[in-house]
Amino acid sequence: SSSSAASDVYMRQINACNFPSAVPFWKMIPAIMCGNTCVWKSPQDAPLLSFALARIMHQAGLPNGVINLVHGKGSGAGQYLIDAVDEGLVNKISFTGSTEVGKMIGEVCGRNLVSCSLELGGKNPLVVMPSANLDNAVAGAYWGAFGTAGQRCTSLGNLIVHEGIYDEFMEKFMAKVK
C-alpha cells in the first residue's frame, strides 16, 4: 500500500510520554502485522522505556529494520520525521501530543495526501443526568479528573451536571475528592 516507489518506511510514530508503550503499540503492531516497517520517535521525557521495549521486540525475533527507534526533541528528531513526508519517504504518520503540533503535522500530511492519525489534547465531557446512578457518576468523574493525574487525552475536561441533581452530586463528589 505504498504511494511512493521510493518509500521504505510505511509509518512514522511520534508519541507522548504519558503512555509510552500502549499508544505506539496500538498503531505499530497492526502496521507490522501487515508487513510494514515503522520509525518510532520516543517521547523526549521517557526515552528509556521505548528503548527497552524496542530491544525486547528485537530479542523476541523481530528482524532488524522493522522497528527503528529515534530519540530526541520534537523540534529536531520529530521534525525530521515530518520532513520525510514532504520528501515522499513515508506513507503514514501517527502523532499523539499537542494540538499545535498536530495541526502542523496534519497540514504537511494533507498537502502530500499522506494518511495521518492525530490524537490531540481532548476536552472530554461527562454529562450527569437525573436518571444516573450518582455513586457511579461520582466514581467516574473522580477517575476521569484525577486518574493518572489527568495526563491523558481521555481525561475529564468538562463536568456537566443537571441542575436537579447538582447539589447532591457535588456533595458526594467533593467528599470523595477530600
Predicted regions: what is each one?
Residues 1-10:
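Single conserved hydrophobic/aromatic residue that forms the stacking wall/gate
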Residues 28-29, 78, 82, 102, ...:
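Generic hydrophobic/aromatic pocket-lining and core-packing "Φ" positions
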Residues 68-94, 98:
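A structured beta-alpha segment of the ubiquitous adenosine-cofactor-binding alpha/beta core
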Residues 16-18, 98:
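Conserved AMP-binding
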Residues 61, 98-178:
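ALDH superfamily catalytic-core signature
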Residues 11-14, 31, 35, 67, ...:
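Buried hydrophobic positions in well-ordered alpha/beta secondary-structure cores of metabolic enzymes
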Residues 13, 24-78:
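PLP-dependent aminotransferase-like
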Residues 5-6, 31, 50, 109, ...:
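Small-residue (primarily alanine) positions within well-ordered alpha-helices
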